[in-house]
Amino acid sequence: MIVRFKRLHPDAVVPFKTYPEDFCYDVVATSEQEIAPNVWKYGIGLAFEIQGGPEDLVIKNEFGKEFLRIPQGREVNVSLDLRPRSSIYKTGMVLSNAVGTVDDLYRGEVSAVFYHVFPNMPRYKVGDRIGQIKLGFTLPIEFEEVDELGDTERGEGGYGSTGR
């Protein structure tokens, strides 16, 4: 899939993988702004255009077995999901919304807001890899109200019901 982008900052870095097998693409900060005490907004200097292609969307497992096919012409909403990198623990920062969703209709600069919850630890600076993105999608959902739901072994067991 091709994701088009517009460079909004001369130092913007095209999202990249360190290793070909990596699941997500790293993004690099081109700007930083403290928008409230210990709350930092980082821009990546890029805007995206995310579109489905003319072909069917086919998703396969690692063995090549197809387990989802969305025929051309079916409604599929595509997004980029921005999430923290695993090394975030070294910064004392927390991504404000855990995972940010960049909708396919958004055309502004992609940015991320972090809480610097441990001010004695370093925070991100311009030029740092501040997060990672991956393609996400959702299919249309119709909600149907029923009087009863089917039984399962788990039933209504909620928080902690499956063990430690």
Description of each model-found segment:
Residues 1-164:
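DUTPase catalytic domain/fold
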